[in-house]
């Protein structure tokens, strides 16, 4: 039985709770520099947790708009990889649907998508929209509320809330890793993880961190493909 929009919403609800906590943290951190309306516009148009945290830091440092745009672009380059992989399940979807799915795809909704792929080979367009939209609404709402509440705190940075996004990614990776153990060989996973870790560390000596993340991800994908081809 194919899953519909509301089943996509239900499947993504646990992740949406994570959006709320991280979004509140993002809003609180941004409160000294942005109004709730400005935060709402940022979340609607940018909609990228890591990029928004970076933008807030750059705003606090009075960085140029060009620098912010380039930083956001580099941070979000990884979305191209996720979108390319996800698009294989929606080849027959209309242009409007594919644009909608690609625009709202995040690390978290991609994680939910991968978890669903472990259960079924058929991912429907309505289910994917439900998966994406619940996070979008939760993120916008949480960041705006966080910005409004943050104005009541004397020093939001003292709470270390900017680490919340990292903590969420660790949780998502741990859950995804457990799922991969059911379908992938341990040797392959270890080879991929080792390739990503070593290449990322070495690349940091030559390129910026966002580029190192992207390049290490590509190297990890290449190693995974090679290992699968040999097995």
Model-derived regions, located:
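Helix-loop-helix hairpins and the membrane-proximal interhelical loops
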Residues: 1-48, 55-72, 76, 231
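Helix-loop-helix junctions within the multi-pass membrane cores of secondary transporters/permeases
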Residues: 70-162
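Membrane-embedded alpha-helical modules
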Residues: 125-214, 222, 226
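Alpha-helical transmembrane segments and their helix-entry boundary regions
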Residues: 39-42, 53, 68-69, 96-100, ...
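Alpha-helical transmembrane segments and their membrane-interface exit regions
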Residues: 48-51, 74-81, 167-174, 217-229
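Short juxtamembrane and helix-loop transition motifs at transmembrane-helix boundaries
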Residues: 1-8, 29-37, 60-65, 91-95, ...
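C-terminal ends of transmembrane helices
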Residues: 81-89, 114-117, 172-181, 223-231
